[in-house]
Amino acid sequence: MEFNVVNLSGTAVSYNLSHVGMTESVSTSDPTHVAETGQLLDGGIKAEKVGGNGSLNGSKVTVDANGTLKVKVTYTLTNKDKSLIDSLFPYGMYVEGFIKLTAENSEEIDLNVPFLAFFGDWTQAPMFDKTYYEAAVLDGAAKWQ
């Protein structure tokens, strides 16, 4: 994904890039049901400068005074992450998270850019996932009162 980091101040600002990636987890009592809590992933990011005013050195982003820096970040799942998702969700599952820009100067604010993707075969995924609490009702074993 590509995004702009905009500096409206009269001095250069620097941020350290990091990330957090996650997917759904499954119920511990029945692994066929989504637990609606996050499962952290080990994937990594690769960042590159696309254009603009500033620099990108490793994970450090610096935006010149009154400048805009365009950055491209690619999030890549590890083989372990892919195996986990494949084992829990045969049709695939969402992968989501944040690209975090932590300001080096404590007077600046930290920034977060959300991302959302899908790993698997989108055309094979069911329209709805049953949660643990809905399973009995949807399977006809219980009735609404």
Please describe what each predicted stretch is:
Residues M1-F3, Y15, V71-V73, V95-G97, ...:
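Hydrophobic residues positioned within well-ordered beta-strands of beta-sheet architectures
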Residues M1-T11, S25-S29, T37, E104-Q145:
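Long, low-complexity ectodomains and other extracytoplasmic segments of secretory-pathway proteins
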Residues L8-I85:
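Surface-exposed binding patches on compact interaction domains or structured appendages
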Residues L56, G92-Y94, A125:
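Short, surface-exposed loop/turn motifs at beta-strand boundaries within globular domains
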